[in-house]
């Protein structure tokens, strides 16, 4: 009997305090990479009422005004007035930045350390995931959740709903039959708003201008619930309402709870950090496996040891949907993809100032050209090398 269940995923917009922190960290990374592609960057951000703290390790010859980068990012997000909880022009910016530890750098720099190749910047495990339930080979709940937060930002910036403020969260619950999404169950959207607007106006505006334009037409919406600002009020938002930290929305950044996560955050880290680059590579591998038709669902785990170039393990799980043995797919992955840090960086062209754009609306399932890990250019190679057994 086919199992029926409801699965939920959430997204948060750039005005959410944790996403503000991610945006600032990645904006600083981009500013450095524009001048120094060999930089080592691990930049963490904390935001709270009237204050930004930048802390971490940065080794670079780039001369960057970190304070101004933080301010510009905050203003771009929309926090430009103390009346809405934060003003990027007036907030304090505290710097606590040092250089990367030499004990770490000797294992990362090519030609140094026990493994003379460029080694992983840390130990750890990373997961990539793909499934065939959407055109982007992403799980539907997280894709719709991102569409909602992105739509809120568009409506706010155009002035279509003039009472919207930057902080926003969405959550989408989808009903499944087996592996197939069949119906929308519940949509939650909580958006910061001006104090004077009524909740009736907020509810009507959100449903008509934000939610309905992004609902897919191929799913059953009979009995769908819309929960708009379910507390009844959302005036205090952003850092005035909650402290924000880089890396605290790693499930929003990835697959919305579908598939697993190794625990390492992405934002503020240059691509020598496998927390980021290997997670992108794992998505690239998983997506190409599904795009090739070798499996309907695929999860890839990569694991690394600090200072060692090659992954210590590579695992493919297709949840019973593969057309050939999973062990054979693992062998194909090792044959066709260079999963050493240097190989990943070259394969995906990661030494570029592309990271601020990843900090909101997810790192995966995006169609912008800089998201090279979303290409399916190795699908034909996988299918060809799989041989007649995959036909």
Curated annotation (Swiss-Prot):
Residues annotated to bind L-methionine: 57, 100, 242, 273
InterPro entries with a match to the protein in the record: ADOMET_SYNTHASE_CS (IPR022631), S-AdoMet_synt_C (IPR022630), S-AdoMet_synt_central (IPR022629), S-AdoMet_synt_N (IPR022628), S-AdoMet_synthetase (IPR002133), S-AdoMet_synthetase_sfam (IPR022636)
Enzyme class: transferase
UniProt remark on cofactor binding: Binds 2 divalent ions per subunit. Binds 1 potassium ion per subunit.
EC number in record: 2.5.1.6
Keywords: ATP-binding, Cytoplasm, Magnesium, Metal-binding, Nucleotide-binding, One-carbon metabolism, Potassium, Transferase
Gene Ontology MF annotations: ATP binding; magnesium ion binding; methionine adenosyltransferase activity
Pathway participation: Amino-acid biosynthesis; S-adenosyl-L-methionine biosynthesis; S-adenosyl-L-methionine from L-methionine: step 1/1
GO biological process terms held by the UniProt record: one-carbon metabolic process; S-adenosylmethionine biosynthetic process
Domain of life: Bacteria
Catalytic reactions of this protein: L-methionine + ATP + H2O = S-adenosyl-L-methionine + phosphate + diphosphate
Cofactors demanded by this protein: Mg(2+); K(+)
Annotated binding of Mg(2+), by residue: 18
Segments of this protein annotated with the region Flexible loop: 100-110
List of residues binding K(+): 44
Residues that bind ATP: 16, 167-169, 233-234, 242, 248-249, 265, 269
Assembly and oligomerization: Homotetramer; dimer of dimers.
Record family assignment: Belongs to the AdoMet synthase family.
Entry function: Catalyzes the formation of S-adenosylmethionine (AdoMet) from methionine and ATP. The overall synthetic reaction is composed of two sequential steps, AdoMet formation and the subsequent tripolyphosphate hydrolysis which occurs prior to release of AdoMet from the enzyme.
Matches recorded under PANTHER family: S-ADENOSYLMETHIONINE SYNTHETASE (PTHR11964)
Listed name of the protein: S-adenosylmethionine synthase
Name of the encoding gene: metK
């Amino acid at each position: 009997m086919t199992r029926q269940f409801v699965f939920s995923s959430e997204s948060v917009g750039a005005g959410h305090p944790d996403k503000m922190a991610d945006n600032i960290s990645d904006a600083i990374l981009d500013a450095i990479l524009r001048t120094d592609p060999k930089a080592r960057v691990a930049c963490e951000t904390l935001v709270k009422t009237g204050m930004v703290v930048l802390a971490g390790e940065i080794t670079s010859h780039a001369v960057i005004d970190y304070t101004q980068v933080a301010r510009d990012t905050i203003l771009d997000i929309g926090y430009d007035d103390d009346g809405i909880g934060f003003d990027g022009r007036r907030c304090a910016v505290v710097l606590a930045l040092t250089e990367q530890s030499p004990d770490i750098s000797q294992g990362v720099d090519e030609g140094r350390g026990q493994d003379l190749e460029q080694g992983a910047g840390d130990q750890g495990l990373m997961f990539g995931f793909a499934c065939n339930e959407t055109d982007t080979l992403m799980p539907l709940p997280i894709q719709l959740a991102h569409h909602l937060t992105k739509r809120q930002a568009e409506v706010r910036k155009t002035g279509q709903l003039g009472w919207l403020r930057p902080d926003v969260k969405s959550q989408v619950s989808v009903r499944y039959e087996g592996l197939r999404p069949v119906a929308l169950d519940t949509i939650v959207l909580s958006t910061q708003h001006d104090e004077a607007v009524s909740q009736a106006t907020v509810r009507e505006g959100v449903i008509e201008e934000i939610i309905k334009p992004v609902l897919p037409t191929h799913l059953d919406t009979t009995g769908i619930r819309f929960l708009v600002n379910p507390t009844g009020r959302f005036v205090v938002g952003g850092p005035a309402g909650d402290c924000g930290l880089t890396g605290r929305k790693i499930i929003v950044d990835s697959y919305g709870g579908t598939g697993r996560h190794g625990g390492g955050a992405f934002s503020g880290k240059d691509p020598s950090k496998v927390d980021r680059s290997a997670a992108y590579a794992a998505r690239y591998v998983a997506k190409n496996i599904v795009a090739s038709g070798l499996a309907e669902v695929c999860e890839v785990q990569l694991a690394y040891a600090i200072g060692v170039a090659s992954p210590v393990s590579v695992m493919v799980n297709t949840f019973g949907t593969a057309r050939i043995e999973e062990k054979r797919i693992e062998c194909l992955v090792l044959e066709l993809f260079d999963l050493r840090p240097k190989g990943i960086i070259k394969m995906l062209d990661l030494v570029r100032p592309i990271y601020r754009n990843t900090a909101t609306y997810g790192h995966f399932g995006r169609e912008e050209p800089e998201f090279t890990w979303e290409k399916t250019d190795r699908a034909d190679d996988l299918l060809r090398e799989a041989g007649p057994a995959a036909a």
